[in-house]
């Protein structure tokens, strides 16, 4: 009997331990990265970025029908189960307006990344349509390559370059566009030094030395920004007021619980009508996202009906 991972959303496909035999059939290159734990169980060498990339390729192909997926060296290689959890909890949030999970919901992914992970999962699981924004032209090229390499995704996912320095929604949400929700995995460090320190902590936790290969990649825009996560989300909150009638729910991951109080104050300042916190857990890792709206219950119901 496979042990369940505590805390994952009930609809998450990754409750059981990875079936490595099946995943190696899906992506044979994964086999070379298998290791044995001290307990004699087969596992993946998570300290090796090539191993994590091979695992992601297998997971996305097996569970989400993404046959062709790759990212350039140096970009974040996201853990698929945790990313899927955000999508499933977001689906529950959207269902509150109509009583059913929305098909064909329109979602804006702020910082879609080279990996395009949230749109890939959301399209397969719920048939949603995505717009992905990104500041990095290299990340956009990578995401577009994934979309173009997998039949059907071009109709479901479109990408936009954020050309305005420091802007989040401005320049991305066009006049008369409407979105059921936005999502975001914001940069969490406030400097390159802090980002390096975070990588060092992960390195030590895995018992690695400085010369060991790392699964802690990430470009500057993925890992840090001035003021860190709180400043980034506060900017998002500030801009969201200008799109109060075009977006039903604004959401963002928040990496640390202690970052919530200043965000709640910012949401009060802009007049958010409702604020929700969704707690998530993947194994030992605790995470959460906050969601806010400028629409009351009746306005959200009308918004959903108008979108269909």
From Swiss-Prot:
- Which GO CC annotations does the UniProt entry carry? cytoplasm
* Pfam families for the chain: Methyltransf_10 (PF05971)
Reaction(s) this enzyme catalyzes, per UniProt: adenosine(1618) in 23S rRNA + S-adenosyl-L-methionine = N(6)-methyladenosine(1618) in 23S rRNA + S-adenosyl-L-homocysteine + H(+)
Keyword annotations for this protein, in alphabetical order, are: Cytoplasm, Methyltransferase, rRNA processing, S-adenosyl-L-methionine, Transferase
Q: What is its main location?
A: cytoplasm
EC id: 2.1.1.181
Where does the protein end up? Cytoplasm
- Supply the HAMAP family for this chain: 23SrRNA_methyltr_F (MF_01848)
| Family matches, as NCBIfam families | PRK11727.1
Q: List the protein's name.
A: Ribosomal RNA large subunit methyltransferase F
Q: What species is this protein from?
A: Escherichia coli O127:H6 (strain E2348/69 / EPEC)
């Amino acid at each position: 009997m496979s042990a369940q991972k505590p805390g994952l959303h009930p609809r998450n496909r990754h409750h059981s331990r990875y079936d490595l035999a099946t995943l190696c059939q899906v992506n044979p290159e994964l086999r070379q990265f298998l290791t044995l734990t001290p307990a004699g169980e087969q596992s993946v060498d998570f300290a090796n970025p090539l191993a994590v990339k091979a695992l992601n390729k297998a997971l996305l192909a097996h569970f989400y029908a993404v046959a062709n997926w790759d990212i350039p060296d140096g970009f974040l290689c996201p853990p698929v189960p945790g990313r899927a959890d955000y999508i499933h909890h977001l689906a529950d949030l959207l269902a509150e307006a109509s009583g059913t999970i929305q098909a064909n919901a329109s979602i804006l992914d702020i910082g879609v990344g080279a990996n395009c992970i949230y749109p890939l999962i959301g399209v397969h699981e719920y048939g949603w349509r995505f717009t992905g924004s990104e500041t990095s032209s290299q990340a956009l090229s990578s995401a577009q390559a994934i979309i173009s390499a997998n039949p059907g995704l071009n109709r479901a996912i479109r990408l936009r370059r954020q050309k305005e320095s420091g802007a989040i929604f401005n320049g991305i949400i066009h006049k008369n566009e409407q979105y059921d929700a936005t999502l975001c995995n914001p940069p969490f460090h406030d400097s390159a030094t802090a980002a390096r320190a975070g990588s060092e902590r992960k390195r030590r936790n895995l018992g690695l030395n400085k010369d060991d290969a790392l699964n802690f990649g990430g470009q500057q825009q993925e890992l840090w920004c001035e003021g860190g996560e709180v400043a980034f989300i506060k900017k998002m909150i500030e801009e969201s007021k200008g799109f109060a009638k075009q977006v039903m729910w604004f959401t963002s991951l928040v990496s640390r619980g202690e970052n919530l109080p200043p965000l709640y104050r910012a949401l009060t300042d802009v007049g958010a009508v409702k604020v929700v916190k969704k707690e998530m857990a993947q194994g030992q890792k605790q995470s959460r996202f906050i969601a806010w709206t400028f629409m009351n219950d009746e306005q959200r119901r009308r918004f959903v009906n108008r979108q269909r």
